[in-house]
Amino acid sequence: MVPYFEMAAASNFSFLCGASHPQELVERAHALDLSGIGIADRNTLAGVVRAHAQWKDIRKESGFRLFIGCRLSFIDGTPDMVVYPRDRAAYGQLCRLLTEGKHRAAIKGECHLEWADLLFRARQFQIAVFPPDEDEPDFAARLTEIAQAAPGSVWLALTMPHQGQDGRRAERIARFAAQAGVPLIATNDVLYHHPDRRPLQDVLTATRHHTTVFAAGRLLEKNAERHLKPPHEMVRLFRDYPEAIAATADFVAPITFQLDELKYAYPDEPIPPGKTAQQHLYDLVWEGAARHYGADIIPPKVQGLINKELALIARLEYEPYFLTVYDIVTHAREKGILCQGRGSAANSVVCFCLGITGVNPTQVDLLFERFISAERKEPPDIDVDFEHERREEVMQYVYDRYSRDRAAIVATVISYRSRSAIRDVGKALGLSEDVTAALANTVWGLSGGGIDRQHIRQAGLDPDNPIIQRAVELAITLIGFPRHLSQHVGGFVLARDRLDETVPIGPAAMDKRSFIEWDKDDIDEVGLMKVDVLSLGMLTCIRKAFDLIHQHKPQLYGGEKLTLASLPREDKAVYDMLCKGDSLGVFQVESRAQMNMLPRLRPQEFYDLVIEVAIVRPGPIQGDMVHPYLRRRSGQEPCTLPSPSPQHGPANELQQILGKTKGVPLFQEQAMRIAMEAAKFTPEEANQLRRAMATFRKMGTIHTMEKKMIDGMVNRGYDRTFAENCFNQIKGFGEYGFPESHAASFAHLVYISAWLKCHHPEVFAAALLNSQPMVFYAPAQIVRDAREHGVTVLPVDVNFSQWDNILEETPDVHLALRLGFRQIDGFSKRDTELLIADRQEPYRTIEDMHRRLRLDRRAFTLLADADAFGSLDIDRRAALWAVRRLPNDETLPLFRAAAASELAQEPRTKLPEMAASEHVIADYETTRLSLKGHPLQYLREGLAAEGVSTCRAVQEGADGRRMKVAGVVTVRQRPGSAKGVVFLTIEDETGIANIVIWPKIMKVFRREVMSARLIHIEGRIQRSLEGVVHLVAAKLQDRSAALIEMSGREAQRLIAPSQMAHHPRNVRVMPNSRDFH
């Protein structure tokens, strides 16, 4: 068979152009018996690692080859060309070429290249030039110039596109080649691995050009021929140019480069004179251990762990990596930035002693092999969380320390998800925005299995309409396709030498940031080490809470400012609060599922919080571990574990692993320990099991470990049924298994945030509000919860408020929470600073403020809308009237005093007072909360007439009782572990109610569940023994119209039409719910 190499294959990393994944191209090329394939995406190397990973398995079986290249597209008229580096040095030059082009482009994601960029590098590449589709007068001269720049390395690409004049076109291209003295090379210029992807490629093309498939015309391919073809088909197509087929082998002959050749070198860290990196790390670790435990009382267990870890770190030469993370953490702490490590790094006593993590090895059993293992040859990965508002300072420190040539953020591939796929496909197929939106709104969360016909019908669409059917089919295929590259949340790659000779680097959308083209899985594949500089809102909240306590209660805690390490531990009052499920705003345990679990688990000590964090996860739930654990914890079920045969090990070997979790494996480390102890896996095999647990839903790889583990346990005397059950529990972890060390890191913050809520609720509420946006709860729910805990909350006021929410002393010596200007939607921090700067004397009137301040009328209107003039003894309506009398912003300075004087002469108009309901509505419109009431109380009379109860009545209702309730939807959740069950949290003037919606009810009332803001529910009370109350829904109604009607009616009376049009919240009564899929 004639060898044929396809050297111009574009994957879907030629964004919105290629219609196949890199893996699909490699797999298909091998299946078609091609000799090899070259992946050449347009101005990027973003997809090559995925192709390489797929090829690694294939090459073990055959001589099939993969080539790493790029299709260069120029902005100066130079024709497109695919280039392949011959060796490692040439690959580095290709990376630098793309990096230069990316930084030259003004628009993120583009790459502006000119022929001069390639000219001095051309001799290092194999180059195939693509002729223009139509005659260009200067093409022959340009081709000759390219050929002279890289003699013997340039080919002219020849395709047979089946467009009616292939023969004539081929003759023209052959003449160009002859004139320039370059050979022809055959290619199919591939855009997809299989012809059935052509319709999707049309959609991608239409999307790229912001048009529809029907209007795209010549922008689309004329047929479905640009797919991978087998060698015999290519030989037939090029029968008049057999030399072009043979040239593919000549083209690849000098190419030796593979990604395997990338040898990563971590940067050396500065160390004290006369010391090695190993000695410096050794000193820092033992100094840290002495600080934690006392120099003479370091526990023997800890000493042994330190020696073990330091020996392995030295063996693998990872000392510089640990020193880097130590340096970053130290810098953050010197700047007063809270930080804490988490993830598998919390398995390391070295990380604990260095102050990187907060998990004390005397509290939790650490499994260092989960973090670093000599056998698996993977670099360590340390995740450190920093305050989200100050994380950028740390990131810029990293850039400054290592330079932008040697440091960059890892990429994140932004891929199509269900809704975005439907939207883009719908637009491309010419569906109206209304139809596309309706179709997209039928989808909740990720989905690759299509859209239920009934859901399409409920959206008011015809599921039998062929365009609708086509849109759904194409969208399903598009899910998972890369849309564009973005920056990772904080993963840095650092290099000893130029990083841009290993991977291209481009500018990020954020100023002063740059990121590489590979994501975290790609860098794992090629062995690059990553330092994660992550952000965590709760750390910001905790730091602000510590500051407020130190500012307002300096007499407490010995006058010292609290730290993560110094806060009082094991406080009974904190655990009592959590046992009640009173955890709104508390880190990691504020979700509905966690609030319901807390009264059942009843945490009494720190390790209970570790379990609490981990147990409400899809892994333990799907592995059927939750109920057995709770039954054993409450004494309803004995905890008995089998033993191996006497000759194979101690009788309590499983008890040592599972004792703390009542015989139930809840953590990844436990799964690995069971495999190593009960089935005698090596550490490498145990890590393979962990990896299989993490990927089996995508790859199905965990089954390859099943026989080995079960047989290993049976051979050591365990019952086969027990071994199978044990393995099935582990398999249930899926990709959701939680490392114990990670849970322990998060449990630390659970306790600290719960302690703040328990002992300083006003401080905690202020810190939460000042750290928004956070995750679960909106400001209205945070304020409601604070008031339920006895906190006095005061409104925004021009004479008392700051930008942040602050604490004020009250006559009864309690601290009240004063809302800040940040709560007013649309009011800027700059205007706040101007207002406060001129507040040495209190503001007396709005006219007084206007004379003293250079705020525009819009700012005054926002203040009036928010009822922020309370201390001036003027209500919202009068304030709005007064603001309308202020001079226009365009008034010239010369006339400003005259205008103000004229304004002052007009007597104040007596306006009718606003109704309480009007005030509440306006509050929600401007500050997203109200201290005066809740919109539902003004609908209560009508609701009561319908027999609708309050949320408080639901909480007090008897088990099994049928009730009706209505409330504003604040949270929607459909956890992946809940098997289609949807949970709603609704709110009225009396509190909240928790709603459970079973899948069969969800199917009937899907639209109401997904879109209602005010919802009416009929159902039956379900009350657990621990007092957790749900209303199990049987029927739902969308009553949002009542809110909208109230909003429109009251807003018309409150705000002039011209103001309504520019209102920052578009006159919404309630903020949107927070939805979690």
From Swiss-Prot:
Keywords: Cytoplasm, DNA damage, DNA repair, DNA replication, DNA-directed DNA polymerase, Nucleotidyltransferase, Transferase. Its EC number is 2.7.7.7. It is found in: Cytoplasm. InterPro entries: DNA_pol3_alpha_NTPase_dom, DNA_pol3_finger, DnaE2, DnaE2/DnaE/PolC, DNAPol_HHH, NA-bd_OB-fold, NA-bd_OB_tRNA, PHP_dom. The keyword Transferase applies. GO terms for biological process: DNA repair; DNA replication. It catalyses: DNA(n) + a 2'-deoxyribonucleoside 5'-triphosphate = DNA(n+1) + diphosphate. Its main location: cytoplasm. GO terms for cellular component: cytoplasm. It is an enzyme of class 2 (transferase). Signal peptide: none annotated. GO terms for molecular function: 3'-5' exonuclease activity; DNA-directed DNA polymerase activity; nucleic acid binding. Belongs to the DNA polymerase type-C family. DnaE2 subfamily. HAMAP family: DNApol_error_prone. DNA polymerase involved in damage-induced mutagenesis and translesion synthesis (TLS). It is not the major replicative DNA polymerase. This is Error-prone DNA polymerase. It comes from Brucella suis biovar 1 (strain 1330). The gene is dnaE2.
